[in-house]
Structures are given as C-alpha cells and as structure tokens.
C-alpha cells in the first residue's frame, strides 16, 4: 500500500484542512445546525443497555466526515476487517492470525485458521474454566489443609496482568460470593512481598499467566510465591492444589510442579494485550463468576458484529478511529485522553495505554519503509472528577490540543444519598465537554468580573486569564450502566478503533518488537551487577550508572 501521505484521499483531506480548518468554530457549528447532535452521534441499542457515542463536539462537519470515510475505504479498512475475522494471518511479522474475536464468538459460527475451525478448542477451554470456577467458588476445591480458597493471586505482566486487573476492578459490584483477587506484575520485590504479607498459604491459589512460561518477571515472581508457599506447606506435592497455569508450554508447567490438568491453554493467534477474553481472564471469571465472564464476552461479541456489519459512516469504532486520524495527521495532535467518570473504571486508561501504544507505537510500514507521518498517540487519563483538579487546566488553557473521550454510566452502582453523588458527577461530566467546546468569550468574562465588583483596573489585569478559547474537541460516550456486557462492548469498541488506525497507517498493530531490545540488554547487564569490579563494556553513562549502584549498594544509612 502507498504511504498515507501519498494517498489522494488523504491529500484532499489535508488540503481541505489547510484551507478551512481555521473556520471550524464549534460554537458557530452548533448555532448553525440545530440538528448537529442528531447528525453527529450514534445511539447503539445492545438489548442489554444503550451506548451513546456523541461526536458532535469535534472539529468536523459533514464534508470532513465524508472525506474521512472515503479515506478509510481507500486504505482498505473493510477488506482488512474481513481478513481479521476470517482468520487470515494479518500479523505478518510473526505469520499469525489475529483472532481475539474468536474467543468471544458467542454465535459459534466456524472461524478457521489454516483450514481448521478454532471454535471447538475455544469452547473446550471455556468449559474447563467454567467447571474450575464452580469448584473454587463453591468451596469444593480444597487447599492442602482441607480449607477452601479465599484469595486468588494472578502473577503475570503486560497483557497477562493489565486486562484482568482492569476488568476485575471495573466489575467489583459483581464479585459477591467470589474469592478476593490480587495482581502481582512488577519484578520489584516490593510488589510480591507486600501482597504475600497479607495472605495465608492455606487459602491462596496462584494463577501463573505466561504463554511461554519463560517471562522473566512472571517466573521470578512465581518461584518466589512457590518458596513462600512451601515454607508453610513443606510438601512439594501440595503445589498442585495451590498453583494453576495459563500457558502453552506443558513441559515448563510440569517442571514447575503444576499438574498439566490445571493448565489452561490459549493459542498463538491471541496477542497478549487482546487476551483477557481467553484463559488469561481466569482471574476475572473466578472473581465475578463465570456467568458474568460470559456476559463480558457477549458484550464484546455484540460490538464485533456491529464493527463487522455496520456501514463505515455509522460504525462506532471506525468513526472514533477516523476522528483520531484527523487530529493526529492533520492537526498534529500527539496525545489522546481517556477520562472515565466512574471510579470502577480507574484502570481503563492504563489498560488502553498498553492497548493503543503497544499496538500502534510503530514507525515501520508493511513494506518495511519508515513512515513520514505520525502514528499512534500517547494515551493517558484518570477518572473524573479527580482529573479536573489535576491536569484539566492544561486541556482548557494550555497550548496543546488534546482530544478527549469522556465516558460515564447514566446509572450508578451506588445511588447513595438519593443519587446525590452521581447527580454531581453527571453535572461535572456534562459541564466539562460543554466548557471545552464553548470556552468563555472576553465579553462573558468581563460581565462576570463586573458582577464580582472588580475595579476597572483589576478587571483589565484579570480579564485575559479568565478567557477560555474553547474549540477543544471531545467525544462523549454515555452508557446505561457499567455491567459486564456493556464493559465488554466498550473494550471491543476501543480494540477495533486501534485496529482501524493501524490499517490506515499501514503498520502491524499486533506485534511488539519494541519490547525486546531492553529485555535483551537487561540479560547482559544482570551478571555485570555482581561483585565490585568496574564495568567498562558500555557507554560512559551506563558504565557510570553501574559503578554508582555498586558503590551505594552496601552503604549504611543512619
């Protein structure tokens, strides 16, 4: 595929942007079109609640949206989408299919890889997860002293950690009757030491999540957990009752002491950051119950079908992707904020920080050439209203344009004080997107200062600081309630958004070679940290850092 910058549709879009973008004033666009909200929003009825995607507060008009959709068609988005769903090996650097959609394929229609339907295997693992969850949650699964399991500790990193952590936090209200769940990812010993300190070996079950069962951080933490466990249990055969594996490497799992019967497999067509739908989601199913895990899968499947079958101009993941292309490749925006107004979604932005940045943080195209345009944005965010008192200042009055997605449920899980808290939360959510769109004109600020009784001199000094330019773009994503089904749909919506942008940029969204170099060098450096002899094999900075660490290692502090 030709580079994006040489695509005639993109050149047309860029020309239009250069000539007309200065005239896209959101206040004026809303005043000129009373139907703007209806024309630039989607109301998705999932039959398990609604998801409203309001993109009317973006710097677009019908002409821009039409050009963006034409651009998507010219970049082959529809064919690429169909290739993914049909099991083609679209992860071309690793020669793999990309089939997280098969993991949640509730219709059970065949999906083939190399001519073989993967659905029987997917369903076999789901059935195994279901019976395991029932045994643990009912108390039938006993530890080495005959006690039931009260705590699940998921040991993994990256995709084996961020997804299950985000989802178990988001679905806490659905965890009644389930074991508590803990996540250990960091190689920093503090993480596992602090976690184990509050647990009892007799009632703890460890999930070791590693596809290869060789991930350094995960296996080091797993060995530490096993040591801690055996200090109490004494008998190595007890490991089988307290450790299960999510892996594809039976030999390594067995060597660790885990019964292969307690190994839940997944496949090379499941990427780590798209794996919470697979056996990697075992901690989710244990915590909230398998029925709720199935609802999560069903919500994602609903969004998969919407993405697969809906024309591009009414397709939520596609529209979100195209708006991102508009801001990144025409306006030069470098970041994207995800701002969920729901405390249960407090890890949502962190999850999609990996989802987006590990997928589209690439500068090499399918042909092996370097791109001559921007690709994936820096993704970040915090829950509202906390963010309002932290970084929104820069979004409102800073020098950078930061497109934002605001997300909120209409119904709260905790309608305390007759819904007062949630009413205030909703009011803040609505106020922020309106404020970012409208801003505050000098004459509006002047009236406020006069009403506050400011002297003419003070008024003139303060006035420039009280003006808001506005015209800051946002999407509002409003859903009935944060249920397992709706959460599944929201996650899938963003997954497909990321996929569409990768196709537009002609990069592989499903490998992550950028993770490898640091890991290779760390293996080389680790033995050099032994002893006290000087190291000279690196650049002067790295050598100097190693020397400082060696000097300070045994320093006694008062």
UniProtKB/Swiss-Prot annotation:
Task: Say which enzyme class the record assigns.
Answer: isomerase
Query: Which pathway does this chain act in?
Result: Carbohydrate degradation; glycolysis; D-glyceraldehyde 3-phosphate and glycerone phosphate from D-glucose: step 2/4
> Which reaction equations make up its catalytic activity?
alpha-D-glucose 6-phosphate = beta-D-fructose 6-phosphate
PTM annotation (Phosphoserine): residues? 86, 107, 185, 455
N6-succinyllysine-modified residues are where? 454
Entry-linked InterPro entries = G6P_Isomerase, G6P_Isomerase_C, Phosphoglucose_isomerase_CS, SIS_dom_sf, SIS_PGI_1, SIS_PGI_2
Q: Does the keyword Acetylation apply?
A: yes
Subcellular location(s) per record: Cytoplasm; Secreted
PTM sites of type N-acetylalanine = 2
Under which EC number(s) is this enzyme classified? 5.3.1.9
Q: Which top-rank group of organisms is this from?
A: Eukaryota
GO cellular-component terms in the record? ciliary membrane; cytosol; extracellular space; myelin sheath; plasma membrane
Q: Which residues form the active site?
A: 358, 389, 519
Family indicated by similarity: Belongs to the GPI family.
The identity of this protein, by name, is Glucose-6-phosphate isomerase
Q: Which organism is it from?
A: Mus musculus
Give the taxonomic lineage as stored in the record: Eukaryota, Metazoa, Chordata, Craniata, Vertebrata
């Amino acid at each position: 595929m030709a580079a994006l910058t040489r695509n005639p549709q993109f050149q047309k879009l860029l020309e239009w942007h250069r000539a007309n973008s200065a005239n896209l004033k959101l206040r004026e666009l809303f005043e000129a079109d009373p139907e703007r909200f209806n024309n630039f929003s989607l109301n998705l009825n999932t039959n398990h609640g609604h998801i409203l995607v309001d993109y009317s507060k973006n710097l677009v008009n019908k002409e821009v949206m039409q050009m963006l959709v034409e651009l998507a068609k010219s970049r082959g988005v529809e064919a690429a989408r169909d290739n993914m769903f049909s099991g083609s090996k679209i992860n071309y650097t690793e020669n793999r299919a990309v089939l997280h959609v098969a993991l949640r394929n509730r219709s059970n229609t065949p999906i083939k890889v190399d001519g073989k339907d993967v659905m029987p295997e997917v369903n076999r693992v789901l059935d195994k997860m279901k019976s395991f969850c029932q045994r643990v949650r009912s108390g039938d699964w006993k530890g080495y002293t005959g006690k039931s399991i009260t705590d699940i500790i998921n040991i993994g990193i990256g995709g084996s950690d961020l997804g299950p952590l985000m989802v178990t936090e988001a679905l806490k209200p659905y965890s009644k009757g389930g074991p508590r769940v803990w996540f250990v990812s960091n190689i920093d010993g503090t993480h596992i030491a602090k976690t184990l300190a509050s647990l009892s070996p007799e009632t703890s079950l460890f999930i070791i999540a590693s596809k290869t069962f060789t991930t350094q951080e995960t296996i080091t933490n797993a060995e530490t957990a096993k040591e801690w466990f055996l200090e109490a249990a004494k008998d190595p055969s007890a490991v089988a009752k307290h450790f299960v594996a999510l892996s594809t490497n039976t030999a390594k799992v067995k060597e660790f002491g885990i019964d292969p019967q307690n190994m839940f497999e997944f496949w090379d067509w499941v990427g780590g950051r798209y794996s919470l739908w697979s056996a990697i989601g075992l901690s989710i199913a244990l915590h909230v119950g398998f029925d709720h895990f199935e609802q999560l899968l069903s919500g994602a499947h609903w969004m998969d079908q919407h993405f697969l079958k809906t024309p591009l101009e009414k397709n939520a993941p596609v529209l979100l992707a195209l708006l991102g292309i508009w801001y990144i490749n025409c306006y030069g925006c470098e970041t994207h904020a995800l701002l969920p107004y729901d405390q249960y979604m407090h890890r949502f932005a962190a999850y999609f920080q990996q989802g987006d940045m590990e997928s589209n943080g690439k500068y090499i195209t399918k042909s092996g050439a370097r791109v001559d345009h921007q690709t994936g944005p820096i993704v970040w965010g915090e829950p509202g209203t906390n963010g309002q008192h932290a970084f929104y200042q820069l979004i409102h009055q800073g020098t950078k344009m930061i497109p934002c997605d605001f997300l909120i449920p209409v119904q709260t899980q905790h309608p305390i004080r007759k819904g007062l808290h949630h009413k205030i939360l909703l009011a803040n959510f609505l106020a922020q997107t309106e404020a970012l769109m409208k801003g505050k004109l000098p004459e509006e600020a002047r009236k406020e200062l006069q009403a506050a009784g400011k002297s003419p001199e003070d008024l003139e000094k303060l006035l420039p600081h009280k003006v808001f330019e506005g015209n800051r773009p946002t999407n509002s994503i409003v859903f009935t309630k944060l249920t397992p089904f709706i959460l599944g749909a929201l996650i899938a919506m963003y997954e497909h958004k990321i996929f569409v942008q990768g196709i537009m940029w002609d990069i592989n969204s499903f490998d992550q070679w950028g993770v490898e170099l640091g890991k290779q060098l760390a293996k080389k450096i680790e033995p050099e940290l032994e002893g006290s002899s000087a190291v000279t094999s690196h650049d002067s900075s790295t050598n100097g850092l190693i020397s400082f660490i060696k000097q300070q290692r045994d320093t006694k502090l008062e």
